UniProtKB/Swiss-Prot annotation:
Transcription regulation listed as a keyword: no
Recorded catalytic activity of this chain's protein: tRNA(Phe) + L-phenylalanine + ATP = L-phenylalanyl-tRNA(Phe) + AMP + diphosphate + H(+)
Compartment annotation: Cytoplasm
Recorded family membership: Belongs to the class-II aminoacyl-tRNA synthetase family. Phe-tRNA synthetase alpha subunit type 1 subfamily.
Domain of life: Bacteria
Coiled-coil region: none
The protein's assembly and partners: Tetramer of two alpha and two beta subunits.
Cofactors (names): Mg(2+)
GO molecular function: ATP binding; catalytic activity, acting on a protein; magnesium ion binding; phenylalanine-tRNA ligase activity; transferase activity; tRNA binding
PANTHER family the UniProt entry points to: PHENYLALANINE--TRNA LIGASE, MITOCHONDRIAL, PHENYLALANYL-TRNA SYNTHETASE
Protein name: Phenylalanine--tRNA ligase alpha subunit
Gene that specifies this protein: pheS
Amino acid sequence: MREQLEALRDDAIKKIEQAQEKKVVQEIRVKYLGKKGPVTEVLRGMGKLSPEERPVIGQLANDVREAIGKAIESKMEALEQAEIHRKLQEETIDVTLPGRPVLKGGAHPLTATITEVEDLFIGLGFSVAEGPQIETDYYNFEALNLPKDHPARDMQDSFYFTDELLLRTQTSPVQARTMEKYKGKGPIKIICPGKVFRRDDDDATHSHQFMQIEGLYVDHGVRMSDLKGVLQAFAKSFFGEERSIRLRPSFFPFTEPSVEVDVSCGICHGDGCRVCKQTGWIEILGAGMVHPRVLEMSGFNPNEYSGFAFGMGVERLSMLKYGIDDIRHFYTNDRRFLAQFKRV
């Protein structure tokens, strides 16, 4: 029995030393030291030994069990250290390699344009006002001198929720709401940036959703020359000092008189080209003197107060300034397009 125990010990230790995985070592533990293992079987046969042999064989069996256990413990520790070393080797970082550059974002071209325009008009004494995108029929139309039968109120031009609620078609309702708040006492000098919505088919120059910036100045003695001076200052600052503007007669229900405002073409410098359709001028916004009826509906006495208003499309300004040929580029989230404006 002594030879049997020593052979078991040597065989187990040899297999433990050859094992390369923890799973194999665990299997050896179960095989030799488990309840059905050979060492346990030897201990169960102790009753057949003589009284003189029992303590000797019992001590040897315990020594064999302890030797196998220590070999298993030592091997498990070695395998764990080897696993740690392997992971460290795989995850080693070469600190001498150059770091990866941090990708920087930038303002969307429309955001950059709005910020630039806001800064320009704030420098001219205007403040920024905002209003709801879901607007009432009254503020979107009636308060702006667009009666019930006006063609601009056709369902084909507007997104209605109910008969009285719609997505605003312009930021002009902010002007009407602001004038109401002042309760007939000026001055008011604001710009109103924001999203507007119209039932247009999307193409290179039209979108069902776009950005507008409108302006309003109401005070005693405001004249058309004041409007022209403000817009001239804006055009020179936004497009360049060499640019000039011209005012053409037009019609808007909420202004009287009304004008379309053009800026001199920056490509041909007024000589005529494909971009300006050989006219030397490019339309940039609509404007005019606030209609007396609009002043009156907002609580101002048109005999005491006058004012001007203007409205411009942010996408159009961006397209003209940066040479963008399709309004849809602003809304496709193409990183190749947007990356060009990181410094804008």
